[in-house]
From Swiss-Prot:
Keyword Protein transport: no
The organism's place on the tree of life at top rank: Bacteria
Name by which UniProt lists this protein: Large ribosomal subunit protein bL35
Gene: rpmI
SUPFAM superfamilies cross-referenced by the UniProt entry: L35p-like
Single biological process term from Gene Ontology: translation
GO cellular component: cytosolic large ribosomal subunit
Lineage: Bacteria, Pseudomonadati, Pseudomonadota, Alphaproteobacteria, Hyphomicrobiales
């Protein structure tokens, strides 16, 4: 059986932490920012840790050797 490939979009969007959690960028910053408050925009900076159920799905389906 051939080796499974990691999805290239997944390896660009997600990183695994040392403890095995999945880190991702914040969502909701592509357009429509004019109607957001400055606090909302500021809080969307940086990265966040995914929920365990979502992270498990990402790892199982898209990053087979992670």
């Amino acid at each position: 059986m051939p080796k499974l490939k990691t999805k290239s979009g997944t390896k660009k969007r997600f990183k695994l932490t040392a403890s095995g959690k999945v880190k991702r960028g914040q969502t909701g910053k592509r357009h429509g920012m004019i109607k957001r408050t400055n606090k909302q925009i500021r809080n969307k900076r940086g990265t966040t840790i995914m929920a365990d159920a979502d992270a498990a799905r990402v790892i199982k389906n898209f990053m087979p050797y992670a």
